[in-house]
């Protein structure tokens, strides 16, 4: 009986943990910008992606492998910013669960103003994805337009964690 009770408690805890991993908060540009600034002296890797973007989906397993390698470093954080529509939030949640995304995922619900906020992230960004931006102390230190290899991602992280 004790074993059964322990098993049930373990299953409940695992289910609760998995539910926490699949929450997606929607934000506007200003909230995302504030979040970037609040990360302080961490190296913040911000990847813009969508579930409908084939190159984005292709690079995510490498991003998760690298995130898992660095996630215990208190000077590192990765955020995946989904550009899917708010009405597709459930699809994003299912995608996170199916792909076992371990980084924090945020849904940027500000598509109508994208011509305003895209140049605030990078003046040369034309809006295509995937895009990965690296920040340290709230300042942009690297911009990568397009798919990023695992090797380039790790190299960029290591260069800026020094």
Regions of interest found by a model, annotated:
Residues 61-99, 113-118:
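Structural microenvironment flanking redox-active thiols in thiol-disulfide oxidoreductases
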Residues 96-129:
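Short, internal strand/loop/helix patches
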Residues 1-25, 162:
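Bacterial Sec-dependent N-terminal signal peptides
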Residues 42-44, 49-52, 85, 128:
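Short pre-active-site segment immediately N-terminal to redox-active cysteine/selenocysteine motifs
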Residues 129-162:
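Thiol-/selenol-based redox modules, centered on thioredoxin-like
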Residues 39-44, 74-77, 101-104:
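Loop/turn elements at helix/coil->beta-strand transitions in domains of secreted/extracellular proteins
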Residues 23-43:
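A short beta-strand-turn-helix
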Residues 48-62:
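Conserved redox-active cysteine motifs that mediate thiol-disulfide chemistry
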